[in-house]
């Protein structure tokens, strides 16, 4: 019927492989926010789903967003440690050295004089991520329902793996644990320097 012919035509449409289509998708994902930027990076590894040229375009997707304000940083630190920034740090750079989709990093100096880099999650990132994941699952199920040929690509499984990966990234304790293990494994290697983590409380 007409509907099935439209489905077949869409799945064969070479626009799915156009680099320009990938660039438009990249801009769209940036507009949608942090979760979708991360998802775009995942899609960049799945040329079997979006096409080689589009995947190549998405590799240019930068995990880089405007930073959130220093007042928000202060509020987060006070909420997490029950004290203001000034009681933990003798110096704290107001402008982050890097701002990505999930967190941003500030250079700072502890009261004791140790120079550190402080990684802070974006405000409400957990809630935003949970909301966006629900939308991605809905879109994946919609794709599988109305475009049966995509089922072999397992869109819902792609979203599931993506969800679990980002959940790990949102838990900075996992990152600290992995870095500590790496430092321990290379403790006897003079040519390797691993980042050490300082627990404030």
Give residue spans per PLM region.
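Broad phosphate/nucleotide-binding scaffolds in NTP-utilizing and phosphate-metabolizing enzymes
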Residues: 1-200
């Amino acid at each position: 019927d007409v509907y099935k012919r439209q489905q077949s035509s869409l799945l064969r449409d070479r626009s799915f492989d156009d680099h320009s289509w990938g660039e438009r998708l990249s801009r769209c994902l940036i507009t949608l926010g942090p979760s979708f930027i991360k998802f775009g990076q995942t899609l960049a590894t799945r040329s079997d789903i979006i096409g080689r040229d589009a995947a190549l375009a998405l590799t240019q997707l930068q995990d880089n967003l405007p930073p959130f304000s220093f007042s928000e940083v202060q509020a987060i630190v006070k909420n997490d440690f029950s004290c203001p920034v000034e009681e933990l740090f003798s110096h704290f750079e107001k402008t982050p050295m890097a701002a990505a989709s999930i967190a941003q990093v500030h250079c700072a100096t502890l009261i004791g004089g140790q120079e550190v880099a402080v990684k802070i999650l974006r405000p409400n990132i957990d809630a935003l991520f949970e909301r966006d994941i629900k939308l991605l699952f809905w879109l994946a199920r919609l794709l599988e329902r109305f475009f049966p040929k995509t089922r072999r690509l397992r869109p819902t499984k792609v979203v599931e793996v993506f969800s679990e990966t980002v959940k790990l990234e949102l838990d900075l304790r996992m990152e600290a644990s992995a870095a500590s293990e790496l430092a321990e494994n290379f403790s006897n290697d003079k040519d390797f320097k691993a980042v050490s983590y300082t627990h404030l409380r």
